[in-house]
């Protein structure tokens, strides 16, 4: 209510991805893994009466001013603190063209899994063409450290 009236600020993920629960027949398709005597509390079993599992949280930020970067971190920390079970994938998608701003989020404290850029390969090419050594080094560090990836990698990374 306070957020709606303008006296507070609501921070929530832009996209959430849930993983549906599995029937025992799906889990036991190749061999017997679960039955009525074992895995009685496993969250992934539909027969245990749970709800879909939070698989991923995606924060979409067109650009990365410092307050937007902080919002992404706040979203992540809220999920981490309030989760039950495994930690979901927590990612940020952005179009930010400034490597130092990308680094401010991607090199953070580990609350964000990875930052995905909507045109990373083009950004790297342009930064190299401009010849900014620091910017090239920053991007290379982020990419080699698997802290920054192209948006095309996101679906496969979330499939795990």
Predicted features along the sequence, with ranges:
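Active-site metal-binding core of divalent-cation-utilizing nuclease and nuclease-like domains
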Residues: 1-48
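A short, structural micro-pattern
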Residues: 9-10, 52, 109
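Conserved catalytic cores of phosphodiester-cleaving nucleases, focusing on short active-site segments
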Residues: 15, 56-60, 72
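Short, well-ordered amphipathic alpha-helices
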Residues: 15-20, 73-80
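Short, flexible loop/turn elements at secondary-structure junctions
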Residues: 19-21, 61-64
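Active-site-adjacent loop/helix micro-motif of nuclease/hydrolase catalytic cores
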Residues: 25-30, 63-75, 86, 100-103
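Elongated scaffolding segments in large macromolecular assemblies
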Residues: 49-52, 71, 80, 87, ...
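C-terminal tail/extension regions appended to the core domain(s) of diverse proteins
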Residues: 82-160
